[in-house]
C-alpha cells in the first residue's frame, strides 16, 4: 500500500490511520462509528523521522465481538433461538484514532443480533 501523495518528513511525527477509510472524515479525533453496520472498525498509530521516513502501523480493533453460548442442558424440546436483543446499548460513537477511545453518542437503544 502507498499513500496518495509523497510527504516530506522534516521532524519526528506521529502517523495515525483508521479503517474503514472515508474521505469525508477529516478530524482524526472524531471518526463516526455505527455498530449497526457490522464494520470492523480499526485504528493504528506509528511514527516517522528524518532517519526513518516509513511508518509501521499496527492496527487494533476498536470494537469487541460478543459471543453467546446457549446450552441445552436437560431440556428435551427442539428449542430454537430466533434472535438475541441487547438493550441499553449505544449504537453510535465517535472514535479518536490517536488513542482508540470511543465517545458514545446518541441515546441508548436496542440492538437485535
Task: Locate each region found by the language model.
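Short, low-hydrophobicity acidic/polar segments
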Residues: 1-85
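Short, intrinsically disordered, charge-balanced linker/junction segments flanking boundaries
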Residues: 2-3, 108-113
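Short beta-strand element of the conserved SAM-dependent methyltransferase core
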Residues: 59, 102, 111-113
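Short, ordered, surface-exposed loop/turn motifs in non-cytosolic proteins
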Residues: 75-107
